[in-house]
UniProtKB/Swiss-Prot annotation:
Its main location: secreted. This is Pectinesterase 1. Pathway: Glycan metabolism; pectin degradation; 2-dehydro-3-deoxy-D-gluconate from pectin: step 1/5. The lineage of its organism: Eukaryota, Viridiplantae, Streptophyta, Embryophyta, Tracheophyta. Its EC number is 3.1.1.11. InterPro entries: Invertase/methylesterase_inhib, Pectin_lyas_fold, Pectin_lyase_fold/virulence, Pectinesterase_Asp_AS, Pectinesterase_cat, Pectinesterase_inhib_dom, Pectinesterase_Tyr_AS. The gene is PME1.9. Pectinesterase may play a role in cell wall metabolism during fruit growth and development prior to ripening and may be required for preparing cell walls for softening by polygalacturonase during fruit ripening. Keywords: Aspartyl esterase, Cell wall, Cell wall biogenesis/degradation, Disulfide bond, Fruit ripening, Hydrolase, Secreted, Signal, Zymogen.
Length: 546
């Protein structure tokens, strides 16, 4: 115990106040210098990592945060920084999920309840995509970078889809999930990956003479066969002669995360049901007796309370999905606005010899790499839309008679960031009018597309364009929105609607004359087809000139 007469603090010698002030000033100056120099050093060292970001300062601030929190060091390379950034990002998305789930349980509005249900599904998918991207980036190869770019493009698309479906009230409520920040971080991740990829070479590997490489030799044989000749794992038949009477039952019974092809054969007939192939239903093939014999039909639509995302008659997000010899339709009609027949968010998916029928928003090519061959798609407004990396070859794209005062738009592509590896490519196809539109072409103009999002990207090449196509070719979405940032191109088309002399004069529109500029939109380039399509057995052309 201290002596009660002894002061608790020992008395020190009195210091010169001028010297003390100088020492204090030096310490403060040193601290400020270090505080200012550290971010500057981060900016200099890692500026290349953020060079393709739309907001490079935001990107650098994220890197600085990782360093400040000792997650990475100033000496860490770009791959390591990106992987740690994504680990943090996955953690943020996982934290957002229970917040959205709680909000969904509290909200009474049917449409917003549905929108939050969609957001939950999309967040779950995004966690998987980002986690898979970390593993792919760690391998440091061009092909794995291409995979990561596709998956991270899907993450950004998922977040934007969620935000698009929410009304202003729900957006305010959901602010606790920092959805806008999740979007910003997805864009930064794509920018970082793009900077690493350009150092290692272009992600789009040219592999000529092959199908998209995600198609195995066994799948190739399956796709060369008809449904009745395939030895299926499960058979669906309305008359009870199969294993199941509905497709939904057969899909539910399919194995989860299958590493081998699982085939469901659907016998001829019309099946009134809505079917979802979830992300855990991998390598699933659904095959019918032909696009005019086996039909899956539904009628969900936005007017009656569904979200666009959930209105699909058939939705598929399980990787490696194949759909063949079947018709998918939504019969809601033009008065019901958005009513999707088929939604696909399955990476490395193939739609072969199928018919997809509806009016507005017929085919939602939502995200990931997709290939459509020898198929027949009908619709009116934005009837092929979404933000997938998708190639159509030898398809019939048929515009129908729309509702009163409507205009037909073949495409509405939804790319929101220049680093997304997404776009719509239409090659060796016929774009024509249906029999009910043909007599009234002058009343209902038809355009090749309009920009749904800021960096919309669509190319039509080596295709037949019927007389239904308006001479302007393309239409605005809203005034001058996206006209400078979109990329719309036409290359070597033919037919009465193919003339380009009266086409729009937008900065983002291009009449392509150099084949090298058309190559990025081929199977080999846009969807890395050389690495996966060959094994499916579906016919395809990987380059130009059929």
């Amino acid at each position: 115990m201290a002596n009660p007469q002894q002061p608790l603090l020992i008395k020190t010698h009195k210091q010169n106040p001028i010297i003390s002030f100088k020492i204090l000033s030096f310490v403060i100056t040193l601290f400020v210098a270090l505080f200012l120099v550290a971010p500057y050093q981060v900016e200099i060292k890692h500026s290349n990592l953020c060079k393709t970001a739309q907001d490079s300062q935001l990107c650098l601030s994220y890197v600085s945060d990782l360093i400040s929190n000792e997650i990475v060091t100033t000496e860490s390379d770009g791959h390591s920084i990106l992987m740690k950034f994504l680990v943090n990002y996955v953690h943020q998305m996982n934290n957002a999920i229970p917040v959205v789930r709680k909000m969904k349980n509290q909200i009474n509005d049917i449409r917003q309840h549905g929108a939050l249900t969609d957001c939950l599904e999309l967040l779950d998918q995004s966690v998987d995509f980002a986690s898979d991207s970390i593993a792919a980036i760690d391998k440091r190869s061009r092909s794995e970078h291409a995979n990561a770019q596709s998956w991270l493009s899907g993450v950004l698309t998922n977040h934007v889809t969620c935000l698009d479906e929410l009304d202003s009230f729900t957006k305010a409520m959901i602010n606790g999930t920092n959805l806008e920040e999740l979007i910003s971080r997805a864009k930064v991740a794509l920018a970082m990956l793009a900077s690493l990829t350009t150092q290692d070479e272009d992600v789009f590997m040219t592999v000529l003479g092959k199908m998209p490489s995600w198609v195995s030799s066994m799948d190739r044989k399956l796709m060369e066969s008809s449904g009745k000749d395939i030895i299926a794992n499960a058979v669906v038949a309305q008359d009870g002669t199969g294993d199941y009477q509905t497709l939904a039952e057969a899909v539910a019974a399919a194995p989860d995360k299958s590493k081998t092809r699982y085939v469901i054969y659907v016998k001829r007939g019309t099946y009134k049901e809505n079917v979802e192939v979830a992300s855990n239903k991998m390598n699933l093939m659904i095959v019918g007796d032909g696009m005019y014999a086996t039909t899956i039909t539904g009628s969900l639509n936005v007017v009656d309370g569904s979200t666009t995302f959930r209105s699909a008659t058939l939705a598929a997000v399980g990787q490696g999905f194949i759909l063949q010899d079947i018709c998918i339709q939504n019969t809601a009609g033009p008065a019901k606005d958005q009513a999707v027949a088929l939604r696909v968010g399955a990476d490395m998916s193939v739609i072969n010899r199928c018919r997809i029928d509806a009016y507005q928003d017929t085919l939602y090519a939502h995200s990931q790499r997709q290939f459509y061959r020898d198929s027949y798609v009908t619709g009116t407004v934005d009837f092929i839309f979404g933000n997938a990396a998708v190639v159509f070859q030898k398809c019939q794209l048929v515009a129908r008679k729309p509702g009163k005062y409507q205009q037909n738009m073949v495409t509405a592509q939804g790319r929101t960031d220049p680093n997304q590896a997404t776009g719509t490519s239409i090659q060796f196809c016929n774009i024509i009018a249906s029999s009910d539109l043909e007599p009234v072409l002058k009343e209902f103009p038809t355009y090749l597309g309009r920009p749904w999002k800021e960096y919309s990207r669509t190319v039509v090449m080596e295709s037949y364009l019927g007389g239904l196509i308006n001479p302007a070719g393309w239409a605005e979405w809203d005034g001058d929105f996206a006209l400078k940032t979109l990329y719309y191109g036409e290359f070597m088309n033919n037919g009465p609607g193919a003339g380009t002399s009266k086409r729009v004069k937008w900065p983002g529109y291009h009449v392509i004359t150099d084949p090298a500029k058309a190559m990025p939109f081929t199977v080999a380039k846009l969807i890395q087809g050389g690495s996966w399509l060959r094994s499916t057995g579906v016919a395809y052309v990987d380059g130009l000139y059929d």
